[in-house]
Swiss-Prot record:
Family the UniProt entry places it in: Belongs to the prokaryotic/mitochondrial release factor family.
Protein name, per record: Peptide chain release factor 1
Gene responsible for this protein: prfA
Entry-annotated residues carrying N5-methylglutamine: 227
Entry-linked PANTHER family: LD18447P
Region (Disordered): 277-303
Length: 352
């Protein structure tokens, strides 16, 4: 029945698209139509196979030898196709994360390990930048604190495009690197870490920020990497008093900075609200991969062995040289998505 309901809704959306002249409604309907199309195409294919199988079984049971022979020729093929179509249909009907299509704020920070941690943070950010290029996404650096020997103590960027959060959300957590630093004369392997945070930045975040709840400070503006921009106090820092969340923006225009800082504040408040809801659903999330918590150790990058291990799913790949360039990062992310889908399907089938 659920499949027919999806098809009915799809046909209703199609009819409304042809009947309305309201631009906003057309945009909303077009978006829903695009989301429903792959589900409906798979549903129709599944229903066709089920119907064909039912008809073939009826023909075999009819006692008509000629009809039964024709049915026998079809039934094996239909039975072979059915399980695959049913699983694909289940995957398409799994509950979606409402933020999967959202843009993100990406934050990479050096952790333990001093200069080597900052260099590793730089490697991670370059990996994400390259992956974004491959995916056709755009990257805008918002704030940078360079490392003393290269890399970054911290770098924050906006990443925009189709389905960014749905793929990048798997990167949140602690990333650990094992390698021989360039400054190491004895050839000893050092371990350091960097922390990655991925915050969804959906359009039109519906969060009200009361004027009484914020303090706005102005300060001297500096650009990415601390380069001096001008001599006016154009940079803006907004502090959200109830939570202690602080955001800054350092463009040349104070007006632009206020807007950007407020947008950043709303994103962080939205993430906080999202995290609280996730915590309330902790039992349901037990079957999913990781928590998105930036304190969770998610991955180890072992350079001497050219090995990457993702600890959440026990995945080990000996192609670190291709992953750290961003070229093969997609393989890791796809493995995480596939495993998450499998676990959620198993949870549904178990009645969880």
């Amino acid at each position: 029945m659920r499949l027919q309901q999806v098809i009915d809704r799809y046909e209703e959306v199609e009819a409304r698209m042809g009947a309305t002249s309201n631009t906003n409604e057309i945009i909303a309907l077009s978006k829903e139509h695009a989301e429903l199309r792959p589900v409906v195409e798979k549903a129709r294919a599944l229903m066709t196979v089920r119907k064909g199988l039912s008809e073939a079984e009826a023909m075999i049971a009819s006692g008509d030898r000629e009809m039964a022979e024709l049915a026998e020729m079809e039934i094996d093929d239909l039975r072979e196709r059915l399980p695959g179509l049913e699983q694909e249909m289940q995957l398409l009907l799994l509950p979606k994360d409402v933020d999967d299509k959202a843009d993100i704020v990406l934050e990479v920070r050096a952790g333990t390990g001093g200069d080597e941690a900052a260099l590793f943070a730089g490697d991670l950010f370059r990996m994400y930048t390259r992956f974004a290029q491959i995916m056709g996404w755009s990257v805008e650096i918002v704030d940078v604190a360079p490392g003393d020997a290269g890399g970054y103590k911290e770098i924050i960027a906006n990443v925009s495009g189709d389905g960014v959060f749905g793929r990048m959300k798997w990167e949140s957590g602690v990333h650990r690197v094992q390698r021989v630093p360039a400054t190491e004369t004895q050839g000893r392997i050092h371990t350091s870490a960097a922390t990655v945070a991925v915050l969804p930045a959906p359009e039109n975040i519906e969060i009200e920020v009361r004027a009484d709840d914020i303090r706005i400070d102005t300060m001297r503006s500096s650009g990415a990497g601390g380069q001096h921009v001008n001599t006016t106090d154009s940079a803006v820092r907004i502090t959200h008093l109830p939570t202690g969340i602080m955001v800054t923006s350092s463009e040349k225009s104070q007006h632009v900075n206020r807007e950007k800082a407020m947008d950043q504040l709303k994103i962080r408040l939205y993430e906080r609200e999202r995290a609280e809801k996730d915590a309330a659903r902790s039992e349901a999330r037990a079957s999913q991969i990781g928590s998105g918590d930036r304190s969770q150790k998610v991955r180890t990058y072992n350079y001497p062995e050219n090995r990457l291990t993702d600890h959440r799913i026990g995945l080990t790949l000996y192609s670190l040289d291709r992953i750290i360039t961003g070229d093969k990062l997609g393989d890791v992310i796809e493995a995480l998505i596939t495993e998450d889908q499998s676990r959620r399907l198993a949870s549904l089938e178990a009645g969880a």
